[in-house]
């Protein structure tokens, strides 16, 4: 897999078509293949799904690793957009991934702030002892 990663990491990658003619892979295709091979080489699983895919509330909750009632609260509070074509809510994968990225960013920012506060308190305590 290492050699395949090297090939896919090149600026331009060509494959042979049915009649033997070379075809250059478009950059988004090459990047996607690179990420797939990288994940597989690290023993990770992969899933390829269209980003416009609509999920049930249970599928969405499973993806976010939260309970369905918690997800429904997030939907009803307007934190994640959803559609309700009939009686059931549907959530787009795009909306879930955006929410997931936003919460990760918020968590990192909060952790950074806590770290800075703790460092400041530690420095103040050390300064008092001197």
Swiss-Prot record:
Q: Does the keyword NADP apply?
A: no
Query: By its UniProt entry, which Pfam families does this protein fall under?
Result: HTH_17
What InterPro entries does the annotation carry?
Answer: DNA-bd_dom_put_sf, HTH_17, SinI_DNA-bd
Decide whether keyword Magnesium is in the record.
Answer: no
Single GO molecular-function term?
A: DNA binding
Alphabetically list the UniProt keywords.
Toxin-antitoxin system
Please explain the role this protein plays, according to its UniProt record: Possibly the antitoxin component of a type II toxin-antitoxin (TA) system. Its cognate toxin is VapC50.
What is the protein's name according to its record? Putative antitoxin VapB50
The taxonomy runs: Bacteria, Bacillati, Actinomycetota, Actinomycetes, Mycobacteriales
The encoding gene is: vapB50
